[in-house]
Amino acid sequence: MTTMAARRSEAAPAPQQLRGSQLKQLRELFRRFDMNGDGSLTQLELAALLRSLGLRPTGDEVHALLAGMDANGNGSVEFDELAAAIAPVLTTQTHLVDQAQLLEVFRAFDRDGNGFISAAELARSMARLGQPLTFEELTRMMRDADTDGDGVISFKEFAAVMAKSALDFLGVA
């Protein structure tokens, strides 16, 4: 075994702990953004993946994220490295959320069905979930999620918040 191969197997364990469907979803996501098909994500490819999730990381943030995931030190992220970074969360009952599932959650919050979540809808939904919000918490959540400043949360803004929350939970944001 070469030194690099030995280093890779130590630093980024294979993602056997992921269930089949999780591994398949993650592999599809990885392949979609591996633009040149070389089996690794460059900084630009990783940035594109993050942007597809609704995030807007700076170049420095993408660089730091890549450095944290790049277990073998080659300057890019291979599938096993991505899987190793995500597996701890996925194996604790968290699943990759597809657009249909995310839309279903969004619609549950969007009580009037107009395609936007208002502050009142957010407050009612959180209370129904057993997580009532103070006025300050509600104001902060709306301010953080409503990136275009129109006073409501669109699906795109909702998806971005959910993606950021997932990355924060992973410790990679």
Swiss-Prot record:
<feature type="binding site">
    <location>
        <position position="157"/>
    </location>
    <ligand>
        <name>Ca(2+) 4</name>
    </ligand>
</feature>
<dbReference type="GO" id="GO:0005509">
    <property type="term" value="F:calcium ion binding"/>
</dbReference>
<feature type="domain" description="EF-hand 1">
    <location>
        <begin position="21"/>
        <end position="56"/>
    </location>
</feature>
<keyword id="KW-0479">Metal-binding</keyword>
<keyword id="KW-0677">Repeat</keyword>
<feature type="binding site">
    <location>
        <position position="114"/>
    </location>
    <ligand>
        <name>Ca(2+) 3</name>
    </ligand>
</feature>
<feature type="domain" description="EF-hand 4">
    <location>
        <begin position="133"/>
        <end position="168"/>
    </location>
</feature>
<feature type="domain" description="EF-hand 2">
    <location>
        <begin position="57"/>
        <end position="92"/>
    </location>
</feature>
<protein>
    <recommendedName>
        <fullName>Probable calcium-binding protein CML14</fullName>
    </recommendedName>
</protein>
<dbReference type="GO" id="GO:0030234">
    <property type="term" value="F:enzyme regulator activity"/>
</dbReference>
<comment type="function">
    <text>Potential calcium sensor.</text>
</comment>
<feature type="binding site">
    <location>
        <position position="150"/>
    </location>
    <ligand>
        <name>Ca(2+) 4</name>
    </ligand>
</feature>
<feature type="binding site">
    <location>
        <position position="148"/>
    </location>
    <ligand>
        <name>Ca(2+) 4</name>
    </ligand>
</feature>
<feature type="binding site">
    <location>
        <position position="74"/>
    </location>
    <ligand>
        <name>Ca(2+) 2</name>
    </ligand>
</feature>
<feature type="binding site">
    <location>
        <position position="121"/>
    </location>
    <ligand>
        <name>Ca(2+) 3</name>
    </ligand>
</feature>
<dbReference type="InterPro" id="IPR002048">
    <property type="entry name" value="EF_hand_dom"/>
</dbReference>
<feature type="binding site">
    <location>
        <position position="45"/>
    </location>
    <ligand>
        <name>Ca(2+) 1</name>
    </ligand>
</feature>
<feature type="binding site">
    <location>
        <position position="146"/>
    </location>
    <ligand>
        <name>Ca(2+) 4</name>
    </ligand>
</feature>
<dbReference type="InterPro" id="IPR051111">
    <property type="entry name" value="Ca-binding_regulatory"/>
</dbReference>
<feature type="binding site">
    <location>
        <position position="76"/>
    </location>
    <ligand>
        <name>Ca(2+) 2</name>
    </ligand>
</feature>
<feature type="binding site">
    <location>
        <position position="112"/>
    </location>
    <ligand>
        <name>Ca(2+) 3</name>
    </ligand>
</feature>
<dbReference type="Pfam" id="PF13499">
    <property type="entry name" value="EF-hand_7"/>
</dbReference>
<keyword id="KW-0106">Calcium</keyword>
<dbReference type="InterPro" id="IPR011992">
    <property type="entry name" value="EF-hand-dom_pair"/>
</dbReference>
<feature type="binding site">
    <location>
        <position position="72"/>
    </location>
    <ligand>
        <name>Ca(2+) 2</name>
    </ligand>
</feature>
<feature type="binding site">
    <location>
        <position position="81"/>
    </location>
    <ligand>
        <name>Ca(2+) 2</name>
    </ligand>
</feature>
<feature type="binding site">
    <location>
        <position position="38"/>
    </location>
    <ligand>
        <name>Ca(2+) 1</name>
    </ligand>
</feature>
<feature type="domain" description="EF-hand 3">
    <location>
        <begin position="97"/>
        <end position="132"/>
    </location>
</feature>
<feature type="binding site">
    <location>
        <position position="40"/>
    </location>
    <ligand>
        <name>Ca(2+) 1</name>
    </ligand>
</feature>
<feature type="binding site">
    <location>
        <position position="70"/>
    </location>
    <ligand>
        <name>Ca(2+) 2</name>
    </ligand>
</feature>
<feature type="binding site">
    <location>
        <position position="34"/>
    </location>
    <ligand>
        <name>Ca(2+) 1</name>
    </ligand>
</feature>
<feature type="binding site">
    <location>
        <position position="36"/>
    </location>
    <ligand>
        <name>Ca(2+) 1</name>
    </ligand>
</feature>
<dbReference type="InterPro" id="IPR018247">
    <property type="entry name" value="EF_Hand_1_Ca_BS"/>
</dbReference>
<feature type="binding site">
    <location>
        <position position="110"/>
    </location>
    <ligand>
        <name>Ca(2+) 3</name>
    </ligand>
</feature>
<dbReference type="GO" id="GO:0005737">
    <property type="term" value="C:cytoplasm"/>
</dbReference>
